[in-house]
Amino acid sequence: MTNDMTKGAITPLLIRFTIPLVLGNLFQLTYNAADSIIVGKFVGEEALAAVGTSNPLMTLAILFINGMCLGTGILVSTAFGAGDTRLVERQVSTTAIAGTVFSLAFSALCVILATPLLQLMQVPTDILPIAVNYLRIVFAGLIFTFFYNFLAATMRALGDSKSALYFLMISSVLNIGGDLFFVEVLNWGSNGCALSTVISEALCCVLCVLYIRWKVPILQLGRRWLVFDGSLLRKTVSYGWASAMQQATVQLGKIAVQAIVNTMGVSTMAAFTAASRIDDFAYTPQQNIGHAMTTLMAQNRGAGKHDRVKQGFLCGMRIEGVYGVLIAVVCFGGAPFIMKLFVTDPEVIHLGVRFLRTVSLFYLMPAFTNGIQGFFRGVGDLKVTLVSSTINMLFRAAAAAVFVLMWKLEIEALPYSYVVGWVVMLAYELPLLVRYLRSHEDEL
């Protein structure tokens, strides 16, 4: 099933495409959050802190792989918009072969480096063994992470954002069930949560492959899955590397902040872990709207419909703004109730509420940065997204270090460091956006 986004009313197209992306990511966050909830409820505070401090490294690896797939998706969208089916086939087969080799090597490297990376993050020695075991299990399953993200990104590039959602919903339910079985029944602790996550991702891959063979003729390549195009690989690496580095840079900034949080005590670590998961729920739809803008713009750019590129950007920014206001109200008002879903300790809940209520006041800022990044990805200028993300994270980490290590501020220092990063990011992106729109005024 494919969806031609070069025709039809833009706002309904964006909304219909975005909703499955949002739901899919919310389900993914749900089964990630299930690890924290179940570990926090059934294992204890130390295990929750270990899972939380492992999460930035785990997410870094996953986002790096996802970034490579996102870069490929932009090229597939452009080729599909231009009607070049043969190019779509070569792009998909080349990425599948190269990605398999890369993800296996990357998985082995991550398993080997798990301990020194956690030590670099200043993880307390009493929870280090728990964190190492959790990470190694997740890292061992990165091949499944690649294939799911690759197949899902390809289907989204063809305009189908619904199919991957259905697979992810099934996988999420199984992951939560697996968490309960491995942790509560078998008493495997955080290792059981990690194993459940890997099994769920493997199932997602199988379901995607079966669906593609049944429903997506353009991807039923047969022997053409073995086609490897070196020239396409170079272009794929160029797009994929920029996108992967952008995703990785964001996560490296989070890791730097996590290292600072690790100096603030186990209660603050646990509160930050739970509050960050909630913040991810709020923030992810903003990214999804940006990704929907990217797909729409890339398809229309490939088709030469530049007027729809500008219309797509303006519609997307309006959607981002409305969502930013709504989620800020929900997170500010519902912070105490939401925190109680994750933990029972009153001190941890209090700290988490303070974090959430502070950061929610500024949710319009990442809404706009994500919309602008979606625009630049869609027009093929991934350098802007990489540089702006790098600037954001450098200033965020530096501000967190000053606020916490030098000024000795408490948990509110962390969301204020986010604001510093967003302000600098917008200061970089806005002039470039205005310059691009003016220089392409005849086309747009």
Language-model segments: residues:
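Transmembrane helical elements of multi-pass membrane transporters/channels
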Residues: R16-D35, I137, Y148, S171, ...
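N-terminal transmembrane alpha-helices
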Residues: M5-F42, P56-G71, L75, T100-S107, ...
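Helix-terminus/linker motif at the lipid-water interface of multi-pass membrane proteins
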Residues: L26, T30-A49, L118-T125, F181-W188, ...
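Short runs within selected transmembrane alpha-helices of multi-pass transporters and secretion channels
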Residues: C69, I137-R156, A164-S172, C193-C208, ...
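Small-residue-rich hydrophobic transmembrane alpha-helices
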Residues: L48-A108, T145-A164, A271-A335, P366-G380, ...
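Short alpha-helical transmembrane segments in multi-pass integral membrane proteins
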Residues: M1-T18, V76-G141, V185-W241, M297-F362, ...
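Interfacial/gating helices of multi-pass transporter permease domains
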Residues: V39-T59, T125-I130, S190-C193, L232-Y239, ...
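Hydrophobic transmembrane alpha-helices of multi-pass small-molecule transporters
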Residues: L60-L63, N175-D179, C204-V209, F281-T284, ...
